């Protein structure tokens, strides 16, 4: 059952970003990003990463919501363009949706998913030990992995957010 929930959330996640990439109007783009961010947090929490899901929810949906609100206020239109009002926008959305359906069918047919990263040793990561049980805590392991092996991810993410805010401010500033 958990596999189907993650699969459905993943499809909603990708369809949301396909809807964002066809970008009919900034108002709908911000809404789709917020919904996709919430679905992404649900996927993370479904895999047991409640700490990481909470952090993504607080940082992404809390911090970037201010930017989305600001850009929506600066770029409001009296008659915003929707997905079905332009044949090109609708075609891009349907093409992305078709590609997603083809990918889903391919994954369901092959029934194998490979691991992207493999670590040679996890023995020196933090171990949460209660009474010599030898159990790894997912939360402590995730935080340790994020700040030790994934330090470059934190730096790239911070830099990407900074560049994103600067680009948004430049676009909304106008002439």
Curated annotation (Swiss-Prot):
**How does the record say this protein sits in the membrane?**
Multi-pass membrane protein
Gene Ontology terms: biological process: mitochondrial electron transport, NADH to ubiquinone; mitochondrial respiratory chain complex I assembly
The subcellular localization recorded is: Mitochondrion inner membrane
At the top level, the lineage of the source is: Eukaryota
The UniProt entry, under InterPro entries, shows: ComplexI_Subunit6, NADH_UbQ/plastoQ_OxRdtase_su6, Nuo/plastoQ_OxRdtase_6_NuoJ
Tell me yes or no: is Nucleus among this UniProt entry's keywords.
Answer: no
A Gene Ontology cellular component where this protein is annotated is: mitochondrial inner membrane
Q: What is its EC number?
A: 7.1.1.2
The UniProt keyword set, sorted, is:
Electron transport, Membrane, Mitochondrion, Mitochondrion inner membrane, NAD, Respiratory chain, Translocase, Transmembrane, Transmembrane helix, Transport, Ubiquinone
Catalysed reaction(s)? a ubiquinone + NADH + 5 H(+)(in) = a ubiquinol + NAD(+) + 4 H(+)(out)
Query: Which residue ranges run through the membrane?
Result: 1-21, 25-45, 47-67, 88-108, 149-169
**What GO molecular functions are on record for this protein?**
NADH dehydrogenase (ubiquinone) activity
Q: Which Pfam families match?
A: Oxidored_q3 (PF00499)
User: Would you identify the family this protein belongs to, as annotated?
Assistant: Belongs to the complex I subunit 6 family.
Quaternary structure per UniProt?
Answer: Core subunit of respiratory chain NADH dehydrogenase (Complex I) which is composed of 45 different subunits.
Function comment: Core subunit of the mitochondrial membrane respiratory chain NADH dehydrogenase (Complex I) which catalyzes electron transfer from NADH through the respiratory chain, using ubiquinone as an electron acceptor. Essential for the catalytic activity and assembly of complex I.
Q: What is this protein called?
A: NADH-ubiquinone oxidoreductase chain 6
The organism is Equus asinus
């Amino acid at each position: 059952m958990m596999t189907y929930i993650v699969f459905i959330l993943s499809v909603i996640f990708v369809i949301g970003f396909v809807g964002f990439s066809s970008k009919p109007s900034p108002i709908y783009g911000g809404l789709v990003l917020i919904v996709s961010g919430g679905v992404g947090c649900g996927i993370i929490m479904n895999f047991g990463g409640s700490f990481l899901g909470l952090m993504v929810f607080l940082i992404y949906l809390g911090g970037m919501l201010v930017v989305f609100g600001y850009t929506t206020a600066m770029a409001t239109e009296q008659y915003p363009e929707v997905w079905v009002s332009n044949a090109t926008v609708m075609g891009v959305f349907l093409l992305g949706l078709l590609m997603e359906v083809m990918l889903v069918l391919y994954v369901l047919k092959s029934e194998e998913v490979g691991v992207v990263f493999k670590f040679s040793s996890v023995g020196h990561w933090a171990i949460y030990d209660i009474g010599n049980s030898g159990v790894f805590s997912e939360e402590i392991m995730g935080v340790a992995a994020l700040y030790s092996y994934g330090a470059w991810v934190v730096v790239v993410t911070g830099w990407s957010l900074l560049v994103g805010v600067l680009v948004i401010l430049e676009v909304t500033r106008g002439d």
